[in-house]
Amino acid sequence: RQNYFLSFKQVLLVGGPTLYMPARPWFCPMMSPSMPGAPSAGPMSDSNSKGSTPRSPARPTVSTGPPMDDLAASMERCSLDCMSPRPAPKGPDDSGSTAPFRPFALSPARFHFPPSSGPPSSPTNANCPRPLATVAPLSGTAFFPGTT
């Protein structure tokens, strides 16, 4: 029982919070084939009773290298998106409305799941949506509702 919980926690820790929310959207195609391996790794570890079993498949499945890159890129994009709207609203109203609206619309589309499951994905999800949300009110609370 403990071993299963540990392995489950490990798998969740290895591929859960890190690549769960942000990676899901763009890693959907890649994760789809890998996902079968992850679930099978869970039961496998249960019967094998080996913590390294789930870890091994989980690591390749997660591909710390590429995903990390993607994650970094996504974070960079996020930061850029969040930063972009900040100066934009300061400038012309028209330009500002387009700048924040664009990333905002893109973000929800990209992170469709994270917003819904905000609480669980708070750590990773907060990185992008949170700044955006903070930027929106910062740029102008009246301006945002006005656009909507």
Curated annotation (Swiss-Prot):
Region annotation (Disordered) ranges: 36-148
Biased composition (Low complexity): 36-45
Composition-biased stretches (Polar residues): 46-55
Protein name in the entry: Putative uncharacterized protein PXBL-II
Species classification: Viruses, Riboviria, Pararnavirae, Artverviricota, Revtraviricetes
